[in-house]
């Protein structure tokens, strides 16, 4: 039986008199991608913080595998525009990082050419790849991605999702991903959890897409996007949006 890296059992989180999460149960397993969907204010980021151990649940239990290595890509990175910070220096700010590990991590996400570039000059897609490379430095068993394609154009989104799937296969890690991108993300997702303070519905994308609570939340168009897009591609996209056929070289989009 596949081991479980993280188990949440009937988790609730309350801030003052306001209940943000109510009765949440889920499991994260190696090699599986779980995507959290939900409207703004649904509690997605709070749930991520619980999984990361940044905030304790008000009730319920959280069990993590001892010594679990987690890589985290935050929703936003705010940097002082006047701060001289290259990608290399930014990577070294992570505790315990060896200089020799930085270039291989960037190479893994097709961003080695950014090593000496200022962080503030990166595009949205380049920035997310650097954050992902930084998250890989501790060889994570669990990757937590909070809106990884925010501020990234469509080609960049496709490239990032292809990369996430590739890393999942190479590392065998679990992936917990928060996303609003119904049409794009579902092709790579094993399980969808639809959240609005509580779990409205969960399961495989094709199952969730027909659930009445999902349709009430995202509408019929959301249901169509979730159900229709789940198919195999014969290509992937590189950092610059170029199409790379799986059994050949590359060509322009």
UniProtKB/Swiss-Prot annotation:
What is the protein's major site of localization? membrane
Q: Which SUPFAM superfamilies match?
A: P-loop containing nucleoside triphosphate hydrolases
Per its database record, what is this protein's job?
Answer: Part of the ABC transporter complex ZnuABC involved in zinc import. Responsible for energy coupling to the transport system.
- State the organism named in the record: Yersinia pestis
Q: What gene does this protein come from?
A: znuC
Domain of life according to the entry:
Bacteria
The membrane-topology field of this record reads: Peripheral membrane protein
List localization entries. Answer: Cell inner membrane
Q: Which GO terms describe its cellular component?
A: ATP-binding cassette (ABC) transporter complex
User: Which protein are we looking at?
Assistant: Zinc import ATP-binding protein ZnuC
Q: Which Gene3D superfamilies match?
A: P-loop containing nucleotide triphosphate hydrolases (3.40.50.300)
